[in-house]
Each structure stands twice: as structure tokens, then as C-alpha cells.
Amino acid sequence: MIVTKKQTCYTDLISRILTLDIAPGSMLDEKLLSDEYELSRTPLREVFQKLAGEGYLNLQENRGAKVSSMDLPNMRNFFQSAPMIYAAIARLAAENANERQITALKMAQKRFRMASENSETREMAMHNHEFHRIMGDMAGNPYLSPSLNRLLIDHTRMSQMFYKPVNSKERLLVWEACDQHDQMIEAIEKADPATIVELTMEHWELSRGRIEKFVRPDPLDMDLGMQEAGE
């Protein structure tokens, strides 16, 4: 299958947005991207329109394309909605998954575990995104899928913090999350919706605290500030 420049631009921009290579709220430079991907204005704008429809960008009249922000109202909506959406998707996935989808989920988990073993933050975040996107495919609900996909955009961006552990305790959390994926796959194979909903909520709570630190970091050391002021 031949991959066009337009397809390359589309998939690459998704990756760059999800991994924070392009920061939330950034305006995209149409001329720069046109040169980088060797696309004329019309196909590039078609890529922007597709990404906007999926929640990655906001198109502003006479101002161009802006990466979806992660401001306070958005984050509030994220933390309110995530548990409900993840639980509903998980239940439907356990009820509706087919063998082909389960195989795809196992492959995504294999890639996620390999990235975890190699401490590859970017790859862990992207493979986790893939894992939960496949669960959305399993659910097969046209009303929930757009909500899940939009949720995953912000979750993946914030998970850069979770997948960059700074001590042994945080590294153990990453491994626990990896093991929970295996347990979720097992529950799906057994068509056990009650178990997977419980696992999904545990999975959410495991990462929630670390994700919150992304938008609410620890305050600066007051003693250090006072010391610098006195010098």
C-alpha cells in the first residue's frame, strides 16, 4: 500500500500532538507545515479539517488551526467524564469483542510491555492510546466512540507524566498498569463485563493522581525562594 504525503502528514501530526511535540494551544504554521510535508495549501487544509473533526485541532476563522487546548474548563470536563466513559466502553468491549479485535488488543499490549521494559515514554503513551482505542472499537458504540477518542487525546498527552517515572515507586505504578492491561484482556476473553469494569476503574485510579500532577505540579520550594531573595 502506497502511503501518500497527505496520509504521512495526518499520522505524523497526530503523533506530534499526542506526544506534546506540538504543545496544546499552539497555532499551526501552515506555510512551515506545507514545506515540511511537501503539500500544497488545499490538501494540508483537508488534513486540518479531518484532525479538527476528530478533536485534535480547533479551526478558527481568519486565524488558522490551533491544537486543542488543555485549559482548566477542559481538564475539569476530562476528570468528570473519564471514569464514566471508560467504564461504559469496557463493559461493551467485554460483551461485543471478536477474535480479530482481541488479537489486535494483545498485539498492542505486547508493544506496550516492550516499550515499558525499555523505559520509552513516548512509545508507552502511544501504545497505551492504541490499547484503549481498540477497546473502543470492540465496544462498537457510535455514540460513545467519539467521546472516547476525544478523551484519549487529552489522556495520552497528560500520560507523558505517568510514563516518565522518577523513582522506584512510580516505576512500580507503570508495571502495575501494564499488568492490569493483561487482566483486562483476560476479562474480555471471558466475556466478563463486571470484572473488566472493576479493573478499568482500578486502572483509572492508578494513573489519575499522576495525571493530576500534570496540571497541578508541586509548588516551588519556599526556602529556596527566600534564600535566593536574601542573596
Model-derived regions, located:
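Short linear motifs at protein or domain termini
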Residues: 1-95, 100-101, 143, 212-231
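Regular secondary-structure segments
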Residues: 14, 18, 90, 94, ...
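A ubiquitous short alpha-helical element
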Residues: 70-76, 90-97, 115-120, 164-173
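Hydrophobic packing residues in well-ordered alpha-helices of helical domains and bundles
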Residues: 78, 105, 124, 128, ...
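Hydrophobic, amphipathic alpha-helical faces that serve as interaction scaffolds
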Residues: 81-97, 130-170
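Residue-level marker of structural boundaries
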Residues: 84, 110-114, 153, 157, ...
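Amphipathic coiled-coil alpha-helices
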Residues: 85, 108-111, 115, 127-134, ...
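C-terminal all-alpha effector/ligand-binding and dimerization domain
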Residues: 118, 160-231
